[in-house]
């Protein structure tokens, strides 16, 4: 068929994608292959709730481009698609939709006609404007209804994501698509859980964890679950007054001086969290500071050392308190872990609210039991006396006020007394702080203290460190079966993965070295439920026993079981246990628990281990390439390496996949920024809608625009006007390719055949040379995942070499039409990964077959590549023709001569002389045999007559002088900028390089203008 004047994506994209789906081009079982190698990519399972944004689009374009490249090269490729259930995030989104009333009809329909106290409470909230408590009540009393609401949205979102993938042109193997809550995934999760348990890596313990008050669940301490927020809070200094001394071995006279010291010198602390004082168990002070204070007080050095030793050994117990607020029995602790340079050098120890405090109290001081000041709802506990039940932030304001009122907060220097304080009863925290800032101005309180607080990434509420009974995976525990810790498995694997960019290998090692035990339990309804079963008749307290206890004690076997419901029934029947009282652990697993098993789950590790060696795991594991964003590098990538090494080390050591990493190459793709270099976000309103860009320009144009920034680890600016500019550039490029094919069609070039005895023209040999350079650059770039370089190689070849020079030469010598058609064929194939839709249309038009199923053909050109060394003079000759043309064009611009005006020139180069017709056509150059002394040197071999064409030499001299002044000014500004230490220290390498390139260009302009002026004079 004849091609239209321009490529119109609206006419083709939907039909082409439907054809790809019908052909199942992503299914490796149906692909044409020419080599035995396989290639696999795992799609990072996107969260269900996410609409397509720039980051998603970039990641999918990258994976699809890599997959198409591998298929084109004859490798059996599997791009495995998946969807993540997004535990915390989805539950938060569904709760929000319930609060907004989206499911009111369904809820009303179900509760109508049911009469009991809990349902009546639900009905009351449904009828009210404030539905904030409705999700909690549904999960408590009608969990199946909440889950029905969730699944309704899940199915809709999954369909939406597949539609978005179609717009992009994604070609994964959808016949293998896996959802992280599918049975295959659940089976692997349950299997892994039991493996951890049997290997003594799994345990349950009361420990200080990150607690999301907003989502009412535990969080891990890595990026993804938590984030940081910079905010201002009051930083308050206050004192603890001496209460008592109890000595086990010393007489009263021995401790009299110490008591006298403390009576006169109460301990001053500083904190941003005064609301936790009722959970204070101790006051830790650095020994150097404590020693210096006692010596200054006049206590003998020997006695000071003895007192410190007795306090450390607990032979001497010193208690402090804040009697007026009900804080008593706070014990003095000597600890080198206190930062002596921060605050007062003394630290209030609240083990239930701070990990450092917990470590000092439990591990160093061995202080025993402690109390919590804040509960899981973010309210103060019963141990807080009159503040019990207050919100943690409001309690902060109240306690600050009461500490000042009771005289425990020192005055600022220069103030002898404070104001009379009566009562304080504001309930709004921000308003409270404004009032306190004014009323308490004389006290040592910095109300504008700026610091970072940990927040829940999903709910954006401030995380509360709390003691909670949770499940953990111990990363530093030795595995019973493998003999290594998970950390050791991870570090071994990190050394085997190729990282792009390489510096991420060190980041991975640093993360693993500092990795803490993984809290895997979440108080959610959505997600994988723990495969833990308790027999309440024998284990009413739901004690989680170790595998060793379970295996060795028959009584314990009737108390707990690990497995799914079917396995439980079999277990009960085999052991003749009563089935009536077994209940499942209510907690859900951290979303990242299943995600970290992704390479094992998708390819079928469990089935492979059970003997199915020919499945996907045996064929495609380890994954060839893993693509990810830097934001989930620690929380996901490092864990996948750790757990994949752990599980594959359980295979027979003779197995080919024994102890294998999950992926060979790890690519950190760029973060997409807006045109000002800011990260895109909904709150800033600076995001780029990929669907709108596709509607405006085409999917191919957006793909190429994004891949033009694909350098591993680098950020890419692509937003606002810049996005339009880059998309337009590549839409124009697509049209350029389209019109090249149209031109060759009019010449019937694609009907010609290229034979081995074909002898190309001067331009043909030059084109072969340029094509070889392009091909080498293209393949090397793909090898290094620098797709921007591969695309640029094609862009420059098509636009500058093929279109600008060779096709123009065909107009005067069409000998090379067969060669040109052949190379354009190859270029269309090379463009397929970057421009799949248009390439499909062009290829179908030329060959009447599917490009998506066509293997790359580049071997035929090698016949001429082998002869290039004998034809280098021809290539050099065409290069000289190009220089002459460019010289003529440049000199016209320099001397302000119209482009269409003929300029006489001479040349001593034989190839330039022989191709005068081409030069005249393309550059309006008129070849001459003789030259005058004032002719301008345009190349090493050629001169041009421009002086005779200048009608007003004086005006041109004046204009040139002005240009020289302007260029010198620009040059001076650039030189000053590059000499600025501030600029060099703060600018990015790219910006600095751009400035140096600008300076080189200005120097070149100046040299040309000065040469011109000399000639004019």
Where are the language model's segments positioned?
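N-terminal, positively charged nucleic-acid-binding surface of large information/translation enzymes
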Residues: 1-294, 333, 350-383, 415-486, ...
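Conserved short loop/turn motifs at secondary-structure junctions
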Residues: 3-5, 55, 82-83, 150, ...
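Gly/Pro-rich turn-and-neighbor structural signature
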Residues: 20, 182-216, 225-227, 239-243, ...
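Acidic, turn-prone loop/beta-hairpin segments
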Residues: 84, 213, 220-228, 674, ...
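Core structural elements
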Residues: 156-166, 188, 732-745, 764-774, ...
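Conserved phosphate-binding loops in nucleotide/dinucleotide-binding enzymes
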Residues: 349-352, 393, 464, 580-587, ...
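Catalytic adenosine-cofactor/nucleotide-binding cores of aminoacyl-tRNA synthetases and other
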Residues: 457-459, 672-676, 681-760, 848-852, ...
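C-terminal low-complexity, glycine/proline- and small-hydrophobic-enriched intrinsically disordered tails
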Residues: 846-1017
């Amino acid at each position: 068929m004849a091609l239209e004047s321009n490529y119109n994506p609206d006419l083709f994209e939907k039909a082409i994608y439907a054809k790809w789906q019908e052909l199942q081009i992503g299914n490796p079982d149906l692909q044409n292959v020419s080599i035995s190698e396989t290639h696999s990519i795992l799609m990072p399972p996107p969260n269900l709730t996410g609409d397509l944004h720039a980051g998603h689009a970039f990641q999918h374009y990258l994976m699809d481009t890599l997959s198409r490249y591998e298929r084109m090269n004859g490798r059996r490729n599997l791009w495995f698609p998946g969807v993540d259930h997004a535990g915390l995030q989805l539950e938060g989104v569904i709760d929000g939709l319930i609060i907004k009333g989206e499911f009111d009809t369904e809820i009303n329909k179900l509760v109508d006609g049911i009469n009991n106290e809990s349902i009546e409470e639900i009905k009351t909230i449904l009828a009210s404007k404030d539905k904030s408590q409705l999700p909690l009540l549904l999960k408590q009393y009608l969990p199946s209804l909440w889950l029905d609401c969730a699944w309704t949205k899940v199915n809709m979102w999954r369909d939406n994501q597949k539609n978005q993938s179609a717009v992009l042109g994604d070609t994964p193997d959808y016949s293998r698509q896996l959802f992280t809550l599918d049975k295959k995934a659940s089976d692997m999760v349950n299997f892994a859980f039991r493996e951890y348990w049997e290997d003594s890596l799994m345990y349950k313990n009361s420990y200080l964890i990150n607690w999301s008050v907003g989502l009412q669940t535990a969080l891990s301490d890595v990026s993804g679950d938590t984030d940081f927020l910079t905010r201002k809070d009051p930083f308050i200094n206050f004192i603890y007054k001496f209460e008592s001394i109890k000595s086990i071995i010393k007489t009263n006279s021995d401790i009299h001086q110490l008591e006298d010291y403390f009576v006169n010198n109460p301990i001053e602390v500083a904190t941003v969290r005064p609301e936790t004082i009722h959970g204070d168990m101790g006051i830790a002070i650095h020994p150097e500071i404590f020693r210096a204070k006692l010596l200054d007080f006049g206590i003998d050095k020997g006695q000071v050392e003895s007192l410190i030793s007795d306090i450390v050994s607990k032979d001497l117990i010193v208690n402090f308190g804040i009697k007026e607020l009900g804080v008593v029995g706070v014990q003095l602790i000597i600890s080198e872990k206190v930062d002596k340079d921060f605050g007062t050098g003394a630290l209030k120890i609240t083990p239930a609210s701070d990990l450092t405090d917990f470590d000092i109290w439990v591990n160093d001081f061995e202080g025993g039991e402690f109390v919590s000041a804040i509960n899981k709802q973010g309210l103060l506990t019963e141990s807080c006396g009159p503040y019990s039940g207050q919100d943690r932030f409001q309690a902060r304001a109240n306690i600050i006020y009461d500490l000042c009122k009771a005289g425990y907060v020192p005055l600022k220097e220069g103030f002898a007394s404070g104001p009379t304080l009566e009562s304080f009863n504001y309930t709004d925290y921000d308003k409270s702080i404004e009032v306190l800032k004014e009323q308490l101005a004389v006290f040592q309180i910095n109300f504008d203290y700026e610091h970072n607080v940990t927040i829940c990434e999903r709910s954006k509420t401030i995380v509360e460190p709390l003691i909670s009974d949770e499940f953990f995976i111990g990363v530093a525990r030795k595995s019973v079966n493998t003999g290594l810790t998970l950390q050791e498995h991870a570090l071994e694997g990190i050394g085997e993965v190729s990282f792009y960019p390489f510096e991420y290998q060190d980041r991975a090692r640093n993360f693993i070295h500092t990795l803490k035990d993984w809290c895997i339990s979440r108080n959610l309804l959505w997600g994988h439920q723990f495969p833990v079963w308790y027999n309440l008749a024998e284990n009413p307290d739901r004690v989680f026993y170790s595998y060793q206890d379970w295996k060795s004690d028959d009584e314990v076997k009737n108390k707990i079981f690990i497995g799914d419901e079917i396995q439980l029934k079999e277990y009960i029947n085999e052991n003749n246990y009563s089935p009536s009282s077994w209940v499942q652990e209510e907690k859900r697993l951290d979303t990242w628990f299943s995600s970290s098993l992704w390479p094992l789950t998708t390819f079928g590790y469990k089935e492979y281990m059970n003997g199915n060696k020919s499945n996907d795991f045996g064929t495609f594991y380890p994954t060839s390439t893993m693509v990810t964003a830097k934001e989930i590098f620690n929380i996901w990538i490092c864990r996948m390496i750790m757990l994949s090494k752990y599980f594959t080390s359980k295979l027979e050591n003779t197995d080919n996949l024994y102890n294998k990493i999950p992926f060979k190459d790890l690519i950190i793709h760029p973060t997409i920024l807006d045109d000002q270099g800011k990260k895109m976000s909904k709150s800033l309103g600076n995001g780029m809608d990929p669907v709108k860009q596709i509607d405006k320009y085409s999917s191919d144009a957006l793909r190429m625009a994004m891949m033009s920034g694909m350098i591993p680890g680098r950020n890419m600016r692509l937003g606002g006007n810049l996005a339009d500019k880059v998309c337009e550039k590549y839409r124009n490029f697509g049209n350029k390719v389209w019109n090249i094919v149209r031109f060759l069609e009019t010449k019937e070039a694609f009907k010609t055949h290229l034979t081995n005895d074909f002898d190309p023209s001067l331009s043909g040999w030059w084109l072969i040379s340029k094509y070889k350079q392009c091909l080498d650059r293209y393949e090397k770039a793909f090898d290094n995942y620098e797709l921007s370089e591969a695309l640029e190689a094609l862009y420059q070849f098509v636009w500058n070499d093929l279109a600008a020079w060779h096709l123009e030469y065909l107009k005067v010598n069409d000998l090379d039409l067969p060669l040109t058609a052949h190379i354009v064929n190859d270029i269309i194939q090379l463009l397929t990964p970057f421009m799949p839709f248009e390439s499909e249309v062009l290829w179908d038009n030329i060959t009447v077959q599917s490009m998506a199923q066509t293997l790359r053909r580049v071997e035929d050109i090698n016949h001429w590549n082998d002869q290039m060394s004998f034809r280098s003079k021809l290539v050099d000759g065409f290069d000289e023709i190009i220089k002459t043309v460019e010289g003529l064009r440049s000199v016209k611009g320099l001397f302000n001569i119209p482009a269409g005006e003929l300029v006489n020139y001479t040349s001593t180069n034989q190839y330039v002389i022989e191709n005068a017709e081409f030069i005249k056509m393309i550059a309006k150059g008129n070849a001459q045999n003789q030259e005058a002394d004032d002719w301008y040197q345009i190349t090493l071999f050629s001169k041009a007559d421009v002086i005779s064409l200048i009608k007003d030499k004086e005006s041109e001299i004046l204009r040139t002088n002005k240009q020289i002044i302007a260029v010198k000014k620009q040059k001076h500004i650039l030189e000053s900028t590059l000499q600025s230490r501030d600029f060099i220290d703060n600018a990015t390498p790219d910006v600095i390089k751009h400035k140096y390139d600008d300076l080189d260009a200005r120097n070149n302009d100046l040299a040309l203008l000065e040469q011109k002026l000399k000639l004019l004079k």
